[in-house]
From Swiss-Prot:
CDD domains: DHQase_I (cd00502). Keywords: Amino-acid biosynthesis, Aromatic amino acid biosynthesis, Lyase, Schiff base. It comes from Escherichia coli O8 (strain IAI1). This is 3-dehydroquinate dehydratase. Belongs to the type-I 3-dehydroquinase family.
Length: 252
């Protein structure tokens, strides 16, 4: 299986990499939170642009991205606008969503973009090609904050992302029971062993799914999300605790 290298970070080998989400509402908070995050122990900085009040103003968005880039130049920067339909803060039209991601790609400030699988097949394929032409990696994602589908459906979605040339397919699902967590882990293992030719990220959310955020190295998930301050999704634990557990499991 091939790995994905962003800056000096190799994703897809060793312990799962830790991603943290910055969810500031304005430029001033972007700056103050970036300074606070700089002291934390993580690998990838995700900027959740759907929390940014002025997200429709591309100049303002890129000014904030520049602050993040300058504050943490060594950290890979993942640009994410999570749509309302997948659990994000803001609704956005497909056209505006694609335009915003293209502007991020054009800026030269971001290393990776998050692209939602169900944006529309043609738009997704075109945006992936555009990102790759500009040396930007694509995390292709799908989120369900209500349920966990069958393992076959989870695998089908991850394989579709792979067929669309995502650098890293990602899926996050809400368990209704402990058996749903097992379904997610089973699907992750099967995908990793039988189909994946690149790193994947999977997680089962909420308190019930916490084990999935810790056991990625065992089942085949290459990264996990931790919280520096406020969690960006239910079930996230602090980066310090997360690093401790991931290191213990890696060294066992």
């Amino acid at each position: 299986m091939k790995t994905v290298t962003v800056k000096d970070l190799v994703i897809g080998t060793g312990a799962p990499k830790i991603i943290v989400s910055l969810m500031a509402k304005d430029i001033a908070r972007v700056k103050s939170e970036a300074l606070a995050y700089r002291e934390a122990d993580f690998d990838i900085l995700e900027w959740r642009v759907d929390h940014f009040a002025d997200h429709s103003n591309v100049e303002s968005v890129m000014a904030a991205a520049k602050i993040l880039r300058e504050t943490m130049p060594e950290k890979p920067l993942l640009f994410t606008f999570r749509s309302a339909k997948e659990g994000g803060e803001q609704a956005i039209s497909t056209e505006a969503y694609i335009a915003l991601n293209r502007a991020a790609i054009d800026s030269g400030l971001v290393d990776m973009i998050d692209l939602e699988l169900f944006t529309g097949d043609d738009q997704v394929k075109e945006t992936v090609a555009y990102a790759h032409a500009h040396d930007v990696k694509v995390v292709m994602s799908n989120h369900d904050f209500h349920k966990t589908p069958e393992a076959e459906e989870i695998i089908a979605r991850l394989r579709k992302m792979q067929s669309f040339d995502a650098d890293i397919p990602k899926i996050a699902l809400m368990p209704q029971s402990t058996s749903d967590v097992l379904t997610l882990l089973t699907a992750t293992l099967e995908m990793q062993e039988q189909y994946a030719d690149r790193p994947i990220i999977t997680m089962s959310m909420a308190k019930t799914g916490v084990i999935s955020r810790l056991a990625g190295e065992v089942f085949g998930s290459a990264a996990t999300f931790g919280a520096v301050k406020k969690a960006s999704a239910p079930g996230q634990i602090s980066v310090n605790d997360l690093r401790t557990v991931l290191t213990i499991l890696h060294q066992a």
